[in-house]
Amino acid sequence: LVNLLLSAETLQTLAREEPETVSAMAEAVAAGRAAVIGGELCERPLPLLPPEVIADQLRQGVEVYQEILGTRPKVFGRRRFGLTPLLPQLLKSQGFQGCLHFTLDDGRFPTGNQSRIRWQGLDGSTLEALARVPTDGSSAETFLRLPERLGDVLDLDHSATMIFAHWPGQASPWYRDLQRLASFGPVLGTFVSIAQQFEHSGSTGQAVEYAADQYRSPYLRQAVAARQRDPLSRWRRFGHRWATLQALQTFRTLASVVTGSPWTRADVEALRRQIESALECDADDTSELDQSLNEAAQAAARDLAAALGSASAEGSGRLALNPACWSRKWLIARQTAEGAEGVPTGAAAPEARSATVDVPGLGFAWHSPEPPAAQPGARRSWWSRSKKSAPPMAEGNVLRNEFFEITFDPTTGAIRSMVDFAGRGNRLAQQIALRTSESDTLPEDWDGAPTTRTWYSIMAAEALEVVTPGPDYGEIRVRGRLCDPYGRRVAGFVQTTRLERGSRLLDLHIELDPEMQPDPEPWKSYYCARFAWDDESAELRRGLHGVARPASSTCLESTQFVEIRSGSASTAILTDGLPYHRRQGYRMLDTLLIVQGETARRFRLGVGFDLPHLPAAAQDFLTPQFVLPGASQPPSSTGWLFHLDARNVIASDWQPVVESGQVVGFRVALLETEGRRATMSLRCFRTPGRAWKLAATAEAQTELPIEEDRVRVPIGPYEYSRIECRW
């Protein structure tokens, strides 16, 4: 018996280059002499990807196995590191019966003394898993120590199992001898396929749930060691591209369900493949992909506007379209005296007032550029006091709005304090720094060995200026340099800090001009944005696949956010797609900006104070604004097409259901983000006829109740599911 661990992409390559080998493989699988382990189209870095990408990779992979081999793998496995607590529910939804809870690459994952476990995922679903780390089938040492290993397994394991792994054609001759011995009798055991092991051996019966911090990927260290280009910013680009692609798909689906005309998925699928492939390549210029993606998203927005009855280029207003399932507030500039229009970018004059437009989730809002007519005020008595004017939002080294106040250090340019008006004490401080180590300039210690010391650079401000004092937003820009402990310049920096009126989100734009490059060890030498807080007992949480999970490790991974929770106060760092963060002690966190091989020099971060729904805010930080200029007013100035009444549920991956060339319904993915069970209502602009939760088989699908224009959907904690609704 042979167990073949290979991805669908590898199988496609074999079918193209070695068709005879694949034909023999298919015959062996059909005859039961071989079993295939796999599942994905290709081995992507799963812990950093959104659930939609992982589910799509599994779906495409299963289709490839079925097409080439005539069967699909029942057990999921991969060589490269990629274990994450989200996998059990996604694998069960795709019809997998078991998985390998180990990888043959670098990285860290939890192990135990049992070869068979019931792996429990984020949502509580369980999947049978094989957790025994394989031994090297090509090494003679494995067989010299075989009696000892067999004794340990028989002593501790509920179902005694040993796993041998080797590259094709590289097995030890002793491994072949062991197979011959086993063919005469089961004295030393019986060789079985992975599928047979799951069928014949019993489970331990107890579900095992591992924390997210027990898994640590080797992606950053591997990327720097392989001299890959942009090991950090490629994830930022992916986050923005994926958010734009989701907006494009949502707009097209909304337009389709309104007009009844389907749209072709070929160009969207091509863009999706390019976005995912860009994670693995070192292309110097990806502007063509960004241009194609942005043009397609704008075209989809115009199609939706036309479906809503708003003709573009025929009116004087603007139509704001929201692809997210939550409402969004945007700052849109009114027409100035010179007739200029547009969303302010920081260069607008203080007198160019803006309007805050509230756009419903999965809806639209039309905005007139003309300021509202002045209302006649009440006659003021001679003894009444004149209204005290509000202080400017930015003055000197202070930036403020209704909720909090930011104070800059005039000497260093760092943010000295972020003070919440509703509480007491400093919530957060921030600075830019280079972290590195040196040993050649330091004296020897007492035993004669050279001393290595890790140090952080020091900020020195050269200019601190108020760019915009208000009244709609304030902006302060700091220019300066970073110096080593001896005063030598190592980099230049520009940080622009922006705060809008009525917002709980602080926007940081950072530009770096490094003169000293980081060392090859990326987790120990880097340029970073460093944050500090005063509560040593504060709990850290990080975004993982769109949900918040506790974070206690030193090295953290999150492309969405890191939350600092102290009592009832929540301070969140929105990472804008930057994935790697290092905790220093109990009160400091470094968000990595530049490591060796990184070419990006401009970065954006956000700091949110008591944001009500953090996963949605993090996704909103990545999603672009869609405002169509010159749009005529639709029949209704504002409205929505779909509405979710549960704020802890995020809808994504909208697709139309097409039959006989007509749109007869839609599909959507739902993710519960806060660990709370709920029965939510999905309201539709048109009365639905039938709806159900999708599953791996038709028998496992669940019919959903419908009440007028509402589809009632029960959803569990951290559950990711897909529903289908037909008119």
Regions flagged by a language model, labelled:
Residues 67-113, 173-177, 508:
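Catalytic domains of cell-wall/extracellular-matrix polysaccharide-remodeling enzymes
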Residues 87-93, 106, 115-116, 174, ...:
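C-terminal (or distal) subdomains of carbohydrate-active enzymes
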Residues 1-49, 53-56, 64-65, 96, ...:
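N-terminal catalytic cores of secreted or lumenal carbohydrate-active enzymes
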Residues 2, 31-35, 69-73, 94-98, ...:
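Loop/turn elements at helix/coil->beta-strand transitions in domains of secreted/extracellular proteins
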Residues 124-312, 323, 484-485, 568-633, ...:
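Catalytic grooves of carbohydrate-active enzymes
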Residues 20-39, 88, 92-110, 118-125:
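Acidic, His- and aromatic-enriched active-site or binding-groove loops in soluble protein domains
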Residues 5-15, 39-55, 70-81, 102-105, ...:
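The substrate-binding groove and active-site-proximal loops of carbohydrate-active enzymes
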Residues 52-93, 145-163:
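CE4/NodB-like, metal-dependent polysaccharide N-deacetylase domain
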